[in-house]
Amino acid sequence: MRVLGIEGAKHALEAATANGVPTLDRFFGKGIAAAIKDRLPKYGRVRLIVAMNVLAHTDNINDFLPEVVGLMEADTVFVSSSHWLVALVQKFEFDTIYHEHLRYYTLKSLMQLFQRHRLGMVDAEITDFYGGSILGYAVKDANGQSERLLSILEQERQVDIIGSLKSMKQVLLNNKARLIGLLVELKRDGKRTVGIGAPMKASTLLNFYGVTSDLVDYLAEVNPLKVGTVVPGVRIPVVHEDVLLRDPPDYAIVLAWNMAGDIIPKYRSLGYSGKFILPVPKLEVIE
């Protein structure tokens, strides 16, 4: 298989190139199809186009999709992953809402968008990516749909999105009050609390909950691009996770809570014996 990447973000471009993936230094937008076609004599026909969590980051989706279609032949498959709105409201994933994510989709709305650009969704599945994502498979001018896709559409018809959003609001306000109450109590008792991880979603969560550096000492992170920064708004410093392991706190908030199943065993294996706090979907303290 011959692969060609399209990447306008400097660090991702450098990483792809370092790993031997030929990559164009530009974003996927108007005019990109022509630039790629210039290289097709070397790479061959476009058989597969993959856009994982890209649509939500695209400023003008109606410039993006015509370029996708312009590269496709009758047997080309366009595979995309998008955060599923149903999962967002049912799992209270409010912290996935931040400045880089411009839109969220149901399968129905994604199919309607694709249809405007001659893309037919023929299959779809729900994955655990980002707490719940639509992995869609589309081809040009297709009409047939898989049973799996139709089942997801039926599932969506059973969901009251507006009602779920209202319920989510109340749950989050309750979580906020409980978390702040817990952190204040721990501080009063002389306990130390930190955060594990500095994902982008942490900025939304910490600012909405009002968790500041008065209550949380720091966030422990392994990504060198984040170490040495602070969380906007609440001004909590980001340090390397070695700080946590050298001087373990009493409590650690798992900010990438959707990955708690991996994070908690990891820190236990590294010797951390304190307690974990999960802030979403419900406030939970894990011994």
Model-inferred region functions:
Residues 32-44, 241-247:
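Short amphipathic alpha-helix with an adjacent loop that forms part of the alpha/beta core around
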Residues 62-79, 268-269:
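A short glycine-rich, Lys/Arg-flanked "PGG" loop and its adjoining helix->strand segment in the class I
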